[in-house]
Amino acid sequence: MAEITAKLVKELREKSGAGVMDAKKALVETDGDMEKAIELLREKGMAKAAKKADRVAAEGLTGVYVNGNVAAVVEVNAETDFVAKNAQFVELVNATAKAIAEGKPANNDEALALIMPSGETLADAYVNATATIGEKISFRRFALVEKTDDQHFGAYQHNGGRIGVITVVEGGDEALAKQVSMHVAAMKPTVLSYTELDPQFIKDELAQLNHAIELDNESRAMVNKPALPFLKYGSKAQLSADVIAQAEEDIKAELAAEGKPEKIWDKIIPGKMDRFMLDNTKVDQAYTLLAQVYIMDDSKTVEAYLDSVNAKAIAFARFEVGEGIEKKANDFESEVAATMAAALNN
């Protein structure tokens, strides 16, 4: 039997990322053959990864990488926040973002087939990470954003990397693009413009807003406060030319009823129309970047602010770790119970 020296164990650890005891056991089982030991560790890693496959990984990090006119934002998950701070995990996240920005895959399958600098596929890198770190490590999603030479990327990560944002701004500079990314991180828009909102989604959200007004009016009635009006519209998508024209006619009728002289109507109507637009685009304000009040200047929307500096938002991508993942509170308890049951049955 070959002598398993500390130097040999160290070499295997450096090549495989395995722990001391795992590396030593692999060398003993393969009689000191380095290549066979690496393959054995890989097989064991796949087995460990398979055992962890049904666990919920809802913690993790986002990664952002800019490669010329292409940028990538990725989300990589782990089971605990503690592991999300692990240096090996952070390195994997950054390497994933870089590989995707450079490889420009079309979907997750193509992304996982990318070859890493180590020579392994991205998929194998995750199998090995799961084995060596000891938790389920999973690549969840990515977005690629592209720009032209005269546009600017704004790359931003918030809350220790739990939120990752890329924006594209035309005009201005990289600093402005980063400010817009900071806004996106804080205000959570889902689309750029109202034109991207689904009509049924707008109707559903408007119904929710009116339900909230109904509940508020019940409370107001108890203290003899006047009821708030219900919203008829929620988005610019619902404000046709006829609707806007009718709103202006209604304002004129209101001014006439109040006895306001016609010669000052032109000074009053624009402000009232702005109020009409504000009151009837609540869904846009919640979900579309351009309609949101800009956090850097709350006197303007994002669109109005960018217009004022001769700039324009072109695109953005925002990931927040764990979005849409149902995290089961009893995962750990279930795992312990299953382990104890297995032990009793053996």
Curated annotation (Swiss-Prot):
PANTHER family registered for this protein in UniProt: ELONGATION FACTOR TS (PTHR11741), ELONGATION FACTOR TS, MITOCHONDRIAL (PTHR11741:SF0)
Organism: Streptococcus equi subsp. zooepidemicus (strain H70)
Protein name: Elongation factor Ts
Entry's transmembrane regions: none
Subcellular location: Cytoplasm
The protein's role, per its UniProt record: Associates with the EF-Tu.GDP complex and induces the exchange of GDP to GTP. It remains bound to the aminoacyl-tRNA.EF-Tu.GTP complex up to the GTP hydrolysis stage on the ribosome.
Region annotated Involved in Mg(2+) ion dislocation from EF-Tu, chain positions: 80-83
Annotated GO MF terms: translation elongation factor activity
Cytoplasm among keywords: yes
Pfam family, one: EF_TS
Keywords, ordered alphabetically: Cytoplasm, Elongation factor, Protein biosynthesis
Family membership noted in the UniProt record: Belongs to the EF-Ts family.
InterPro entries: EF-Ts_dimer_sf, Transl_elong_EFTs/EF1B, Transl_elong_EFTs/EF1B_dimer, Transl_elong_Ts_CS, UBA-like_sf
GO cellular component terms, semicolon-separated: cytoplasm
